[in-house]
């Protein structure tokens, strides 16, 4: 299963490192990544391959990063993401 992870917050050192390290520890492959900084606002979208990983466990760990770094992080199934953003 593929999932989309979005991260938004004040730009600070280590955001990409924290998220990608957690994904690495769960053997989750990053298929695509887009990251932009607009003034002090950091935004990132990742497409990941969740094969063998439990969405709930990953969401829980992302919530920990979200709280620790004062970010907004969301994860959802790629199919749901695409359905919600179809014009």
Q: What are the roles of these predicted feature ranges?
A:
Residues 1-87:
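A conserved regulatory-domain signal marking ACT and ACT-like small-molecule sensing domains
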């Amino acid at each position: 299963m593929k999932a989309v992870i979005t991260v938004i917050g004040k730009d600070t050192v280590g955001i990409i490192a924290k998220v990608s390290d957690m994904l690495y520890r769960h053997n989750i492959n990053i298929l695509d990544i887009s990251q932009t900084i607009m003034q002090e606002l950091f935004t990132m979208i990742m497409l990941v391959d969740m094969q063998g990983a439990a969405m709930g466990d990953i969401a829980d760990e992302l919530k920990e990063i979200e709280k620790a770094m004062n970010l907004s992080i969301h994860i959802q199934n790629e199919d749901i993401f695409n359905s919600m953003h179809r014009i």
